[in-house]
């Protein structure tokens, strides 16, 4: 499996510009022969999004933009792994999760929230994100794969 790592320079909160960069680099990666293109943690939203994750409107816009990326990527053969902010399960103590989604064949085929949230030095993720309770494998081009 040929994997491309797309280290993009995104902007916190600028969902549309970040989505455009993701799609541009996805096309470039596929042209270079990649079967999977992996983007950074929180590539869609920018890192660190801090208090933006406390606004339901931001979470809703993020979900809509992630779906728009999936729709635009429908013509690609390569699968994309995109970091984004997801809504936590109902009744969670914190409303957002730091997550990764697999986009394949124009749809979001898998999503996983981060389990181990750093909370030291410059990291304050436990303040803003709900950790995942478990981790599942995804399938990339017929192969079971872990995304951490």
Language model segments and positions:
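Enzyme catalytic cores with a strong preference for nitrogen-chemistry domains
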Residues: 1-148
């Amino acid at each position: 499996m040929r994997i491309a790592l797309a280290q993009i320079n995104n902007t916190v909160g600028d969902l549309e510009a970040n989505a455009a960069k993701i799609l541009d680099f996805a096309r470039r990666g596929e042209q270079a022969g990649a079967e999977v293109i992996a983007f950074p943690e929180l590539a869609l939203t920018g890192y660190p999004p801090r208090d933006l994750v406390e606004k339901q409107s931001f979470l809703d816009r993020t979900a809509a933009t992630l779906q728009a990326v999936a729709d635009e990527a429908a013509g690609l053969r390569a699968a994309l792994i995109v970091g984004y902010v997801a809504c936590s399960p109902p009744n969670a103590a914190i409303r957002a999760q730091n997550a990764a989604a697999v986009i394949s064949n124009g749809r979001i085929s898998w999503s996983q929230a981060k389990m181990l949230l750093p909370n030291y030095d410059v990291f304050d993720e436990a303040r803003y994100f709900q950790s995942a309770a478990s981790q599942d494998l995804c399938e990339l081009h017929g192969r079971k794969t872990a995304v951490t």
